[in-house]
Each structure stands twice: as C-alpha cells, then as structure tokens.
Amino acid sequence: MTRNTSRLIGTAGVTPGSYILSECTLTASDGAEFDIKALITQIVITESIYSASIDAEIIIMDGVNLFESAKLNGDEKIELLIKRQELDTKNTEKHQHTFYISEIIAFARKRNGSSTYVFRCVSKHAYVNNTKTLDQFKEGTIGSIIKGICTSDLRIPLKELDVNTSTYKNIKCIIPKLRPLAAIKWLNSNAFTTTGAPFYFYETLKGKVQYKSYEDFADSDVVATYIHSPVLISTIGSKEYYAETSRRINKLSSDLNLSKYIASGEGAYASTTRSIDIATKTYDVKGQQYNYKGVKKLNGYDPFPKRNNNDQYGGQPIDKIASGKNYFISSNSLAYGDKQFNFQDPSIDSMGKCQAYLSTEDTIVHDIVIAGNFNLESGQLIKIQVNKTSAFDNESDPIDKMQSGKYLVASIIHKFADEYTLQVEIKSNSFNSDLNDVLTLEGTKGSTEVIET
C-alpha cells in the first residue's frame, strides 16, 4: 500500500475516498519501533453500538522479514494515524487510535520473497478486560456504577469517556465474579431511562467509549443527509463533485425482514410483566401491562398499521394484545433493607417498554456503502433520500417515503484500500409514511393495481 491514495491534488483529496496513511508504527515486545506503512495492503476497522470495543484487521505483505525482526508474538502495540485534507476548506480530518494486536492469523507464502498475514487488533481497555474479574458490592445508578468500572477497572481516562449516568433508580448489587466488560453487560440488562428506553455501551473510531440511551440517539441532531441517486452531474476535481459524492449512496441493500408476526411475538407492541417478591412472598398477578406508547420514534409514523379488524390477532388492535408476551421477574425488596432497590427492581416498571424499543429498533434496516467520512460514527442520526423505482414517471413526487427518512447508524466498517469507503448498517424504528395511507389507483376498489413488467 502506498502512503497516499492516487486521488490527491498535492495533499488535498479530490474525492471523499481520498486519504493519507500518515503513521502506522508497530512497537514490539522489547520496545523497538517499526514503521510498517509500506507493508500494509488494507486496513478494516469495525465499530458498532453493540460492541464494547472497536476492532481492526490490518493485512500485511511482508517482504522485509518483519515477522522475525520484530519477534512478532501477538501482543504488540500499533499506533495508527490516517488523515485527509479537504479540497475546498483545506481543513485536515483524521482518525488516530492506538490498537493492541489480539491475534496474528492467515499466514501464507504465496510467492517467493514475501509472506502475508493479518493483525487482528482491539483497543487497550479490551485487553485490560482479560486481566481481572470483579466480585464487588456496588451501589448507585447503574450508569454511575458502569462509569466507575470504566475508570477504575478498565483504566479508561475520563477525557475518553462519555457516560450517561442518569439511569432509572439507585440500586444495590454484588457483581458475581465477572470480567469488567461482562459485568457492564450484566448491569446493562437492567438499565433503563426513567421512561424505559434501553442503554448501549460502545466505542467509536472518531470519538470515545460511550454509554447512551436510545432516547439520547433519538434526541440528537441529524449529522448528514445521503441520497441514493443513479447518476452524477458534476465533474471530477471540482468542489461540486466532492460535495455530491460525499452525500451519495453508492450501494443500498437490505434483508428487510419486515415481520409483524415475529415482532408481536417478541412483545414489540404490547406485553405484560409479572413479578414475585421473594422477601414478602407476594405475586403481582395483575402485572404491569404495557401497550405501545411513549416510544421515541425517529420518524413520524408508528411501525404498525392502526386498524381494529385484525383477524390474525383475534380481532384486536396489534398494540392491545398484551397477554401474548409475558415477562416474569423475581425481586427481593428487603435484600438491603426497607425501600432499598436491588438489581432486578428497575425491570419491573421498565421491561415492557424496553423490549418495545429493542424489538422495533430494526423495523427497517439497510446496508449502505458511502464514501469515506471522518466525522460519521455509530450512534449518530442520518437522513437518507431514496428515489422511487419509477421516479421518471413521478417527477412531481419522486421520493420513496417508505424507504426514506431518519435512520440510526448502528455499525460502520471503515475500509482503507485503494479508497476510503464506509459500509454502514442503518436502522429505523418507525416509518416516514403512514401505513394506513395505502395508495389506490384510479379504477380499483380498495386495492392497488400492480402492473407486471
């Protein structure tokens, strides 16, 4: 891999896929440093709101006997700096991160004079996680407990943390001999906002180790708008070309998986929570009945049609079938004294709505490929604009409202090869179009005519 991509004017990028591999330094076990920029053929870095650490795969073509010279053994440090200068503003954007090799895999000698292998890398706190287990008493909000684990056990500096500590209820618990990241996952299973939204613990390449709720995501501003357009209208090298390709969706695909059958079975729209208090031997038979309401939607319309004549749901509206999904929770109201909440207590009030968030967050999912963006990260909101398949026949209204709208960036695969590209998984928990507003063509009765081509 050359240190620069070919699409540069001086040090400025002609396209959003341009970048400069400015630094890639490997520190061996004995402290010796090696500049390995010239040996790299590809870098792939993955981040996700479901992953506690970013990870990287660095593909090496070794023609200088690095493996023996550095005595590679699988715990080396790699300091990475990738940057780009914008063509019009001359502002410099960058990704800078310190990784630690977790595995060296895929060794091969396919030609004389060189060998290939792959460094799999993780962040420092993921490495630290493997060195200890926790079996401590903790109290406070779950968010504050998680923040404490990050700073004291995972040794993450405060400046590299962004933790929402305002989780529902102060609790007391004993962590049952878990590694720090497993303890955070265990605690997070009972972490909610005051209105029942779930939390996510994750790391991004651009930012910090973060702990945020779905409400935090939904309340944030849209950071970019991307357009799925079949043609480019500007000339390469111009400012207009850079701007146009920056917001263009190059590929869009989806497994779709739209299913009210599965969602209703998961309690996405209605459920009942039943609890037993083992201290007082009382059972809440009536339960906490939840019907879909109060969920913060990314777009304006619910993820289900509002109708009453649902034969498949026993003639009930889909958001009223609360007996179809039941959650059973054991609590101990006297574990730490009167009016002291133990670990399970927040779930009694919040489990139904939390599951509604979790079951509807991927109501509609797309995988898109876009040009490299140094400022896009998981947990942000974007808008996409998708043209109708018959856009040329609908010039007055060419936008597909069902596919367009606000989406949450759930994961990003940063790929640095000939160009910098992003493969982004985006999700929305709602629609940009009313599902009750079914279009009817002239000359049909209560249905839409479909013309086969």
Label the model's feature ranges.
Residues 22, 54-56, 76, 95-97, ...:
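Envelope-exposed proteins and targeting segments
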Residues 116-118, 123-125, 162-258:
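Short beta-strand-centered interaction patches in the first periplasmic/extracellular domains
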